[in-house]
Swiss-Prot record:
Gene: eno
Sites where the protein binds (2R)-2-phosphoglycerate: 163, 339, 368-369, 390
Single GO molecular function: magnesium ion binding
Name of the molecule in the record: Enolase
Organism: Geobacillus kaustophilus (strain HTA426)
Gene3D superfamilies documented for this protein: Enolase-like C-terminal domain, Enolase-like, N-terminal domain
């Protein structure tokens, strides 16, 4: 393997029309890697910091020229000459250069762009697909897609409180079949919503964003769409929710304000509500059911539902091994959402996935609401045999780019490809 000879960053746009960072890395022996950095709408308090310029005269203050400059002026001179294959050493160098706990000096968007582009350049130099370069020849498990087909909360301008209602085609025999099932249900949902007189505009992640009467109506409508598409809810297709409760939590009164429904709930009442929903609908996964700082609430939720429902920590764990270790020790949750830009380097991302698996927690590799055509997370999902991926509806190119990459990977793997379906939920006690 050869050394890095050039690193270059530029400002480009993400799927929401906001600026983001793109990084290119070149090696001595002709390796080339390009990576684009995603951005979240509902962000965790403890996430690595995304550097924005704050100049209101440019992109309403959301420019990333400072992050781009940090790559070109500070990071590039330090990593040019380093061995491109030494991902851990390069990521360690990036962390040292920044010197802060949350990557606020150089920006997680600058650091991540470099980290991912380095991996792509190394894979390119070796002539290997990225998933195989990162995961070796054991990388062959295709993830079950967690498809966000109905949006609310911070991802849509409507009166639905829960941020994401998702389907998981666990009964499929292959990823290709799972994607087809998801797409058919998505189109079926559009027809169901139209028949009810609801809007079929889509939100940030490609799901529909109608003004429904209640959060429960969203679940009922999706069940109707699954059946209309010819599938069996609870057998072939399960439901998942991302509540994004930190967006509902009021710090002043310590309660959850479901404004769409006009109700206020305590932590205990939220847990009781989830128990009721799980008893009525085939819900297999709940993400961020309580506020990121409501550890007692999360512990109660885990005690009540942790054996039969995947309880995913997103804002709770922020892809951070310190936060995850605390959760494991306290018996909170049984799954972690993996977002590369929450932590900022590929090495730290892999560390979080490894820690989760060792503790019997699942790892769900995830996009952000502000995405790009970059499909790296598809390769990461296969490289780590994560078993689950959350990357939006089968709609909008920024989401479909990941699904199409997984189709390519499944084709490349041929008969060695594995689609585990319901077996991906090894954290649940049957």
């Amino acid at each position: 393997m050869s050394a890095i000879i050039d690193v270059y960053a530029r400002e480009v746009l993400d799927s929401r029309g906001n600026p983001t960072v793109e990084v290119e890395v070149y090696t001595e022996d002709g390796g080339f890697g390009r990576a684009l950095v995603p951005s979240g709408a509902s962000t965790g308090e403890y996430e690595a910091v995304e550097l924005r310029d704050g100049d209101k005269n440019r992109y309403l203050g959301k420019g990333v020229l400072k992050a781009v400059e940090n790559v070109n002026e500070i990071i590039a001179p330090e990593i040019i000459g380093l061995e491109v294959a030494d991902q851990v050493a390069i990521d360690r160098k990036l962390i040292e250069l920044d010197g802060t706990e949350n990557k606020s000096k150089l920006g997680a968007n600058a650091i991540l762009g470099v980290s991912l582009a380095v991996a792509r350049a190394a894979a390119d130099e070796l002539g290997l697909p990225l998933y195989q370069y990162l995961g070796g020849f054991n990388a062959k498990t295709l993830p079950v897609p967690m498809m966000n087909i109905l949006n609310g909360g911070a991802h849509a301008d409507n009166n639905v409180d829960i941020q994401e209602f998702m389907i998981m085609p666990v009964g499929a025999e292959s990823f290709r079949e799972a994607l087809r099932m998801g797409a058919e249900i998505f189109h079926s949902l559009k027809a169901v919503l139209k028949a009810k007189g609801y809007n079929t505009a889509v939100g940030d992640e490609g799901g529909f964003a109608p003004n429904l009467k209640s959060n429960e109506e969203a679940l009922q409508t999706i069940i109707e769409a699954i059946e209309k598409a010819g599938y069996k809810p609870g057998e072939q297709v399960m439901l998942a929710m991302d509540v994004a409760s930190s967006e509902l939590y009021n710090k002043e009164d310590g309660k959850y304000h479901l404004e769409g429904e006009g109700v206020v709930k305590t932590s205990e009442e939220m847990v009781a509500w989830y128990e009721e929903l799980v008893s009525k609908y085939p819900i297999i996964s709940i993400e961020d059911g309580l506020d990121e700082n409501d550890w007692e609430g999360h512990k109660l939720l885990t005690e009540r539902l942790g054996k039969k429902v995947q309880l995913v920590g997103d804002d709770l764990f922020v892809t951070n091994t310190k936060k995850l270790a605390e959760g494991i020790e306290k018996g909170v949750g049984n799954s972690i959402l993996i977002k590369v830009n929450q932590i900022g380097t590929l090495t730290e991302t892999f560390d979080a996935i490894e820690m989760a698996k060792r503790a019997g927690y699942t790892a769900v590799v995830s996009h952000r609401s502000g995405e790009t055509e970059d499909s790296t997370i598809a390769d990461i999902a296969v490289a780590t045999n994560a078993g689950q991926i959350k990357t939006g509806a089968p709609s909008r190119t920024d989401r479909v780019a990941k699904y199409n990459q997984l189709l390519r990977i499944e084709d490349e793997l041929g008969h060695t490809a594995i689609y585990q379906g319901i077996r991906s939920f090894y954290n649940l006690k049957k």
